[in-house]
Amino acid sequence: MSESNSTGILPPAAQVPLAFLMSSFAFAIMVGNAVVILAFVVDRNLRHRSNYFFLNLAISDFLVGLISIPLYIPHVLFNWNFGSGICMFWLITDYLLCTASVYNIVLISYDRYQSVSNAVSYRAQHTGIMKIVAQMVAVWILAFLVNGPMILASDSWKNSTNTKDCEPGFVTEWYILTITMLLEFLLPVISVAYFNVQIYWSLWKRRALSRCPSHAGFSTTSSSASGHLHRAGVACRTSNPGLKESAASRHSESPRRKSSILVSLRTHMNSSITAFKVGSFWRSESAALRQREYAELLRGRKLARSLAILLSAFAICWAPYCLFTIVLSTYPRTERPKSVWYSIAFWLQWFNSFVNPFLYPLCHRRFQKAFWKILCVTKQPALSQNQSVSS
């Protein structure tokens, strides 16, 4: 995004600490997102459809720390004049990266919504890598179309006498800014909030269904059925009059009669054993079903909680800047008031690129395992070297 060079030339006592803080902030953004990218490269188990979208988010946020902030530091602190070419490159790149980060959050939220609300169809889909890459590329194309053409077209609207400020030509056109803020902030917030509400609603319905007697009656019915079969087998085995008579007159029966008695006894014993096995199978299946449902509910709650945190961080980091930008656009370019709060709101957007890796990827167990795997790989050469020295 853009902020006019309103600070002027600061004294050296303030320039050096601020430059150090800004550079450290950019470096922290790069490190946090680089860990996510490296984890995706190292661990093949992370190459799942939803994790590709986290990779896309990490790439956009990483480039914010690599390009947007480093170019901005000398401009805002040391009054370095970009020049028209570098200024245009910085504006398009910064707007593109920030908007792509926002749209990646929307794509991640939609994917999580599909995995919870339509779990069966989501798992049945075998999305190819080309389709996933197409969705990732579509995010970047849409992000460019939101601001890129307007930045290029409005370059001629700038006042030629003021060449120190690197900002788009439409910053004083409130209606254009309103449309762009609608596309890059308000609609994404509404979309992510909608997906999050739908996830909570789906979890609530699933939980209510699991507590419903008709749903829970499966295990009871199966248990009673197995008990009935078991009792029937025992009754057939103990109350058969033919068996009692055969036992009483076993010395007077022919060998053929004895063999038929043994066959009948063996048949009843097998039926009782079969009934017992069926009852045990039904009970184990019911317990496994309840465990799977409980695991799905826990997974859905975790996803919903992570999306709620992701949405809250995005709204907090972007809302102040959008509000300030629209309000300041109503002033003429040369009469806009200078405000420290606007500078803070401006940096909050980039702060969102810093917190994104810690909101979901680095808190996910698979990403954590991949992170420790990276550390083990880096420590392994040093360990082998120490062993060779000791030997």
Swiss-Prot record:
Transmembrane regions listed in the UniProt entry: 20-40, 53-73, 88-108, 132-152, 175-195, 307-327, 344-364
UniProt GO MF annotations: histamine receptor activity
Segments in the Extracellular topological domain: 1-19, 74-87, 153-174, 328-343
Disulphides: 87-166
InterPro entries noted in UniProt: GPCR_Rhodpsn (IPR000276), GPCR_Rhodpsn_7TM (IPR017452), Histamine_H4_rcpt (IPR008102)
An example Gene Ontology CC term for this record: membrane
Sugar attachment sites: 5, 159
Major place of residence: membrane
Residue spans of biased composition, Basic and acidic residues class: 247-256
Membrane-topology annotation of the record: Multi-pass membrane protein
Gene Ontology biological process terms, A to Z: inflammatory response; positive regulation of cytosolic calcium ion concentration; regulation of MAPK cascade
Cytoplasmic side of membrane: 41-52, 109-131, 196-306, 365-391
Subcellular location: Cell membrane
Keyword Transferase: no
Region (Disordered): 238-258
Keywords, alphabetical: Cell membrane, Disulfide bond, G-protein coupled receptor, Glycoprotein, Membrane, Receptor, Transducer, Transmembrane, Transmembrane helix
Superkingdom of this protein's organism: Eukaryota
Protein family (similarity comment): Belongs to the G-protein coupled receptor 1 family.
Quaternary organization: Interacts with TSPAN4.
Biological function: The H4 subclass of histamine receptors could mediate the histamine signals in peripheral tissues. Displays a significant level of constitutive activity (spontaneous activity in the absence of agonist).
Name of the featured protein: Histamine H4 receptor
Annotated source species: Mus musculus
UniProt lineage: Eukaryota, Metazoa, Chordata, Craniata, Vertebrata
Gene that this polypeptide is encoded by: Hrh4
